[in-house]
Amino acid sequence: MDLSVVIPLYNESESIDELNTSINNILNNSGLDYELIYVDDGSVDSSWGKIKDICKNQNKLSAYRFLKNYGKSMALSAGFKKSKGEIVITMDADLQDDPNEILALYKMINEDDKHIVSGWKKKRYDSIIFKNIPSKLFNWAARKASGIKLNDFNCGIKAYKSSVIKQIELTDGMHRYIPVLAKNAGFNRISEKIVQHHPRKYGKTKYGADRFIKGFLDLLTLSFVQRFGKRPMHFFGLFLSLIHI
């Protein structure tokens, strides 16, 4: 199979039909052998009912459901494990990611022989104070900590070689750092593509101050593992030295 599109979602019932129609209209004319994988992360609205309805008559669709909300990392991990495509593309279900980017990402990761191509929402339609500025700070810190020159680590739309996502293990909150986990596993051909971003059409954002803080805490954890993972006693030696001083 050429392509798997993995779509994690939580309470996005209003956007599912429109998103599904748009993706299939694009991919049906592409000549690619593809599949769409929806992962409902414990939605409490009618999302799961909508997904079941669209899956009834479409053999390219599959869907999986968590009975409670485990977070985006776990939803992506479940979708990755079920994916069969040589290329795996992820995107959010809120219609802010543009399905027209799918084929461009697919072409870029193949022709440029990349392990990962990450989307970059260079022009964003989000709150400047509550999302744009925190996002810039977060991405600056992630670049410094990881050495990976990406401008939008948290962008939902990304393309991966299947060998990458089958190799790494996602834990809670680490979906933001898949490029870092991939680099640590030896997959270092990572690039980015400027992608179209749309204003949220339905519902409200699920990103808040708590997620921003958690993202930084996860980055600290990842930085610790990167620096001391193979020699953790070096950290404790440094820590004890500081205490002694």
Predicted regions and their residues:
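A conserved acidic beta->alpha catalytic loop
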Residues: D40-G49, L95-Q96
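Acceptor/aglycone-binding surface of glycosyltransferases and processive sugar-polymer synthases
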Residues: K60-K82, I87, P99-Y177, L181, ...
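Conserved small/polar residues in nucleotide/adenosyl-binding loops
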Residues: I243-I245
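Acidic helix N-cap motif at the loop->helix transition within catalytic regions
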Residues: E14-E18, D45-I54
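Short beta-strand/loop segment that forms part of the nucleotide-sugar
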Residues: L32-S43, Y64-R65
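Short, well-formed alpha-helical segments that are part of the catalytic scaffolds
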Residues: E12-L27
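Cell-envelope/extracellular polymer assembly enzymes that use nucleotide-activated donors
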Residues: D2-S4, E35
